[in-house]
Structure formats: C-alpha cells, structure tokens
A protein has these predicted regions:
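Glycine-rich phosphate-binding loop signature in dinucleotide/nucleotide-binding domains
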Residues: 87-94, 165-166, 200-202
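Peripheral (often C-terminal) accessory segments that flank ATP-dependent C-N-forming ligase machineries
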Residues: 6-8, 14, 329-416
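A conserved helix-loop-beta module that forms one wall/lid of the active-site cleft
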Residues: 112-182
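ATP-dependent carboxylate/phosphate-activation module, predominantly the ATP-grasp catalytic core
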Residues: 190, 209-275, 279, 286, ...
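ATP-binding N-terminal substructure of ATP-dependent carboxylate-amine bond-forming enzymes
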Residues: 8-124, 339, 401-415
Length: 416
C-alpha cells in the first residue's frame, strides 16, 4: 500500500460535493491514468487499486492518484474488497467504483453491490451487458435490428434447424467474451459436427447468422439521465478473427462525421439497455448488401454492446479526430453531470499497423517522412495486443476518406 496524497485547491471544486472515486487498475491499459488525472483536476479524490508495485507506476500515474492500494492480485476478490473497505474507512463513503475495463466489469458490479455504490451497474444488471444471449432481449425490446441467434446448448439438431432458416455460414462464439478469442466460423455440416465434438464448453456458446459488412461503433459518454454528452463513430475491419488467425495487417479509423441513422440507433440502444453514467462502445454492422429481415445495403444492424471505452488507442484517436478530450468529458460527467469540455474542428483519425514478419515496400523512415505533418502517434505495440494489432503502429489525422485510403495503402504495401 502506498500513499501519494496531494493538497487540493478547494476553490476549484466549490461547485460540486467532494467525492471519493475508486479506480480499479489505473495503470492498465496504460493510457487510463488520463481518466484519473482528469478526475483529480476536477477535484475528485481518486483512489487507485491494482496489483502492480507502486514503484513500477510512472510519474504520471502516481500524480493522477490521491492514494494507491496495492493488492497481491486483482483476481482475488477478498483482497480487492479489503482495499475498498480501507478507503471507505479512511475517506468516508465511496461514491464511484469503476475500471472502464471489460475484464473487470463483473467485479466492479460486485463491489458496487457490496458497498452500496449506486452510480453504476450492479449485480442484478450485469448479465444484460456481458452475455450475448441476454443482449438480444434488449435489442428486441428497443426494436433494434440484430442478427438471429441460438444457444449452442440447445444441441446440434436445434442448430441444424436454425441453419435451415439462416443458411451457412454461421458464427459460434462464447456467450461471454470480447474480440476473436474462441470464435469459430462454421461453413458446412462437417464443421458443425466438429464444433460439437471438439469444443468441450460448447454449452457456453451462442451461434449467429453470418453478416457481412463494415463494423461501425457508436462511441459515447452517457450522463445520469441516459443522454449522450459526446458521440463519435469508428469504422473497424470486418473480421478481427481473420486478422488474428491469418496474421493480416490492421487498419481502422475514427470518422469525421456520424450518419444520423447510427446516431439514432445508438441512442435507442442506450435507452433499451438502461445505460447511465458510462462510456459506451456499441458495435453495429453496416450491411454491404440487402439482407432479408434485417435491412438494405447501408443500413445498420446491432452486433453487441460494450459498456466501456473502445480498446487500444481509440480514445486518443477520437480526441484527435474531434479536437477534444474524451478523458475530460468523462471526468466532467462524473464530477459535474455535464460536459465542460470544448470540441473543435472535425477530421479523420486513421490507424495502420505492421507486423515484423513481413517486408514492406516503404520503410519506417519513409512513412514518417511522408506523413510528418499528419502523424499524431507512432510507437511499438505492447506484446499483449500484437496478435490483433501488429508490432508497429502509425496514427495520422487526415481530411478526407481518399487520404485515409492512401495512407493505409502506403503503410501496408508489401515489397515485391
């Protein structure tokens, strides 16, 4: 346990009650200390809990916290519970508990329930945002188009009947989970049989009709009334599963503008799920062809909800695209219930990465030289993210989709 308390200028915080905010894992992902910094600048006492040694925190991470409590493992609920109890004893009532991290959402909800923290999701609501099978009920409730689905636990005969309706291929994926991990594309009967024969926990899977199109996300910060304080759209590659399995190069971008149809569906989804006080990342397909029962080419179809910010450097990319600070907008929502952060000029922010196993037509130095004026980030990716995101990333701010496409082509072009 380490104490890094600082003295506040109370003149900066006279317009809201002094609050105690426990941030779980403020050091990882490694950009998340910025949420803590903005909270602290808004006069909030930021109390960090993680399992990293205090001396391994960066100076920025330390400065963003009022106090830090190290546990042996964040996986040990009893230890984390005792850490929260320690803060409650020393600082008084805990107002918020949050990680903004998919991995810890259930633990966050458990802690809120045990400590009667009412500013976020609790145990009785967690299944609706973690289980894909539960998500479908809320999409239907909100009248939001979404892919048809069946639980694999219903058995192979039930899936055969399902396939007669929707056709091959289908996608089988864990009911609880994110990304491509544990996901199967099933294209014929033999693969369906192999899935049931080889996947020991198939009872914990769902199967969905396969939809093709761009994946577009509605990224928003939602206030206590369930209304957006900020909205943005990111366009993702159609299959992270293929990128991981086939070792493809990755690119994606934050869009300059959001179609009104996505904005309307995003807001309806927020209301259907009863979301409040959160940064959300809601995924939709943009159909690349007409699809009976779902919509026409260009329409949006719900994929899944994520009650946390988009992964990787996407929050920073949103900042560059929208000339704003989403870390600050989120902290404003917590401290003031409104955004006190300006937005400026809008543009595209594009990400493209490379893998060390390939030889590229243009050198690292050529990429830096060509995009010197537009480059906003350039670094090696952490090993944890390299399977999906490659080893070397470049992120630029651009004015048109033509420029985005040219940038991706230049970075990804292979040597002949």
């Amino acid at each position: 346990m380490q104490d890094c308390r600082t003295v506040y200028n109370f003149a900066d915080v006279i317009d809201h009650e002094f609050m105690n905010f426990i941030f779980i894992s403020p050091h990882f992902p490694h950009t998340y200390w910025q949420f803590c910094r903005r909270l602290k600048q808004n006069g909030v006492q930021v109390l960090g809990i993680a399992d990293a040694p205090y001396d391994e925190l960066t100076g920025e991470q330390k400065d963003s916290l009022t106090e830090y409590y190290r546990v042996g493992s964040l996986e040990n609920y009893d230890e984390v519970y005792r850490a929260v109890a320690y803060f409650a004893f020393h600082y008084g009532r805990i107002d918020w508990i949050e990680s903004n991290n998919e991995y810890w959402l259930e633990q966050d909800a458990h802690l809120r329930t045990d400590f009667n923290v009412t500013t976020g999701i609790r145990n009785d609501q967690i299944s609706s945002i973690k289980e894909k099978s539960e998500m479908k009920k809320y999409y239907i409730k909100g009248g939001i188009p979404t892919a048809r689905q069946i639980r694999a636990a219903e058995g192979i005969d039930a899936l055969r009947n399902f396939i007669r309706k929707v056709g091959y291929p289908i996608i089988a994926k864990p009911d609880v989970g994110v990304g491509a991990s544990g996901t199967f594309k099933i294209e014929e009967d033999s693969q369906l049989e192999a899935f049931f024969d080889t996947v020991d926990d198939y009872q914990n899977y769902v199967a969905e009709e396969f939809i093709t199109g761009e994946i577009c996300s509605y990224d928003a910060i939602i206030n206590a009334e369930g209304d957006p304080l900020f909205e943005s759209m990111t366009v993702w590659p159609p299959s992270i599963m293929d990128i991981v399995n086939l070792k493809l190069d990755l690119s994606y971008y934050v869009a300059k503008e959001m179609p009104e149809s996505l904005r309307e569906l995003g807001r309806r989804t927020v209301k259907a799920f009863g979301v409040w006080n959160r940064f959300v990342h809601l995924e939709f397909f943009r159909l690349d062809s007409d699809r009976e029962g779902l919509g026409q080419k260009g329409d949006f179809v719900a994929l899944e909800v994520n009650m946390r910010p988009a992964g990787g450097y996407t929050p920073d990319m949103i900042n560059y695209a929208q000339s704003t600070d989403v870390y600050k907008i989120w902290a404003d929502m917590v401290a003031f219930g409104e955004s006190r952060t300006q937005q400026g000029a809008q543009q595209y922010c594009a990400f493209a990465s490379r893998r060390d196993i390939y030889q590229y037509a243009h050198s690292h130095e050529e990429v830096l030289s060509r995009y010197a004026d537009q480059m906003v980030m350039c670094e090696r990716m952490p090993e944890l993210f390299s399977a999906a995101m490659g080893q070397q990333m470049y992120t630029v701010r651009l004015q048109s989709m033509e420029e985005v496409n040219d940038f991706v082509e230049f970075v990804h072009e292979k040597r002949q």
